[in-house]
Amino acid sequence: MFIFVVGLNHKSAPVEVREKLSFTEAQLSEALHKLQGMAGIEGCCILSTCNRTEIYGASTDMEKGMTAVKRFVLEWGQLQPQDFSKYFYVHTLYDAIRHLFRVASGLDSMVLGETQILGQVRTAYQRSCNEDCSNGIVNTWFQQAITVGKRVRTETGIDQHPVSISYTAVELAEQVLGGLKGRTAMVLGAGKMSVLTLKHLVAEGVDKIIIANRSVEKAEELAKSCGGEAISFADVNHRLEEADILISCTAATHYVIRKSMVEQVMDRRGGKPVFFFDIAVPRDIDPEVAQVPGTHLYDIDAMQHVIDRNLAERRKCAAEAEIIIEHEINQFMRWLNSLFVIPTIVGLKNKGNQIKEKELDRALCKLKHLSEKEKKLVGSLASSIVNQLLHDPITQLRHYAASPEGHLYSEILQNLFCLDVPGQRQKHVVVHYPAVEQRQNRA
């Protein structure tokens, strides 16, 4: 059984190509069953997100399986044959395992180390199982990938260094205030950035949220989603005194928070500090606000320094993650190689027994004078010779099955002995084995 991944992502294809091979929830069920019904596909899973569409599969015939998937993506996406070689990547065996493990760990994402992808991998796998389109190998592959993704985040802390502006603003607020529980936050704006900011505020346990927007209706929609309160911009001056934190992300072309307003607010607060986070471009908050006693102003440039530092930390964590992934790949390869080895051993024994039976029948036809007891003795002798001849190859094959290149030894043995192992003797399939290649390069 061979495993593979065929896909395209934000690095390999522009959005106008990616959107052609995207799937709605309803389409995924149809697509999975169409794939599963194609010749050469034993199990499959489709991972479809904003930045990638990937088809993971297992096949007993690599050539048939790859042909089927190529036909599927070209038909579904209404793409031309030249698009496949231009925009798609194909990984098999070791490289396929590594790819999924890195994807689940957030190392192949647009935002290094992001956490959302692990949930998307889990959802894709669960959908494949629910549609009865997975198989034993795909099950083990994805289950281990999910485990690897969790392990990478737990052991490296790669997701503990925020690199989005909205998250960084909330994270900074938590750090300077020593936590957000019991605090009141005001958010200006009701766009995408505000939605993300509110999500992070809720996750950090902020006590009260006030959302201000020019359109109160939009603010009310957001307030319902987070248990907050909606107000108009006209009310900001009177309500700001309640807030410990203000995060502003409007689309205004002028300052919406001015020094004079903040001076009045701070007088009413009795000097109790307020932390301002301006994540808008152009800026929403007059820089002179920072001159008002008790205020602390962070604009997008100040937060970018934090993001740059955190991104450097994530890169360090990613290097640690690659070591974990390499270990997990070797573990999975040992298991996968054992699946190749067992049929090879069975095929080798069958080949030996076939030769034994054929030659034994031929010999006994010429030795008709032998008694039944003597014929049994000759048969036992033939069996003993076959078993002893096969003992060393089988023992060594079992030993090498635990190595990353175990499949290579299995395939060599199949070719040397012309073994009939269904679905495993592949023509024109090039498989790379890093451990073998490294030794060859050193030699």
Curated annotation (Swiss-Prot):
Top-level taxon of the source organism: Bacteria
GO biological process terms on file: protoporphyrinogen IX biosynthetic process from glutamate
Listed EC numbers: 1.2.1.70
Enzyme class label: oxidoreductase
Entry annotation: catalytic residues: 50
Molecular-function annotations in GO: glutamyl-tRNA reductase activity; NADP binding
Catalytic activity: (S)-4-amino-5-oxopentanoate + tRNA(Glu) + NADP(+) = L-glutamyl-tRNA(Glu) + NADPH + H(+)
Site (Important for activity): 99
Its job: Catalyzes the NADPH-dependent reduction of glutamyl-tRNA(Glu) to glutamate 1-semialdehyde (GSA).
Note: During catalysis, the active site Cys acts as a nucleophile attacking the alpha-carbonyl group of tRNA-bound glutamate with the formation of a thioester intermediate between enzyme and glutamate, and the concomitant release of tRNA(Glu). The thioester intermediate is finally reduced by direct hydride transfer from NADPH, to form the product GSA.
Subunit composition and interactions: Homodimer.
Protein name (record): Glutamyl-tRNA reductase
Organism encoding this protein: Heliobacterium mobile (Heliobacillus mobilis)
Name of the gene this protein is made from: hemA
